Amino acid sequence: MRKTYGITNEKFLEVKKAITENGGTIYSDNRFEIKGVKGRFEKDYETLTIVITDKPWLASWEMIEDKLDEFFIEING
């Protein structure tokens, strides 16, 4: 699954902070893992693409997408 959001560099730092504050891990090659969801960031100027590569089997792709959308609405205020 791939989702793209408009986001500033400052907000991207907030995203990374939120992941680590909620028990997630961010790796040096822009991969991340949080609560069984694995993926990677692709950052380009003011666009952030999140690619989800793995998820818990109980979580639907739609659920993951909805959570991402909710999070980015909140982070962009």
Language-model features: where?
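A general marker of short, structured functional hotspots
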Residues: M1, T8, G23, K67-L68
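Terminal, regulation- and interaction-focused segments at domain boundaries
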Residues: M1-K17
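Beta-strand elements of well-folded, non-transmembrane domains
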Residues: I7-K11, N30, D54-P56
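Ser/Thr-rich, low-complexity intrinsically disordered terminal regions
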Residues: E14-K17, E21-R40
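Short, surface-exposed beta-strand/loop "edge" segments at domain boundaries and coil↔beta transitions
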Residues: V37-F41, P56-A59
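C-terminal structural segments of small proteins and small subunits
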Residues: L48-G77
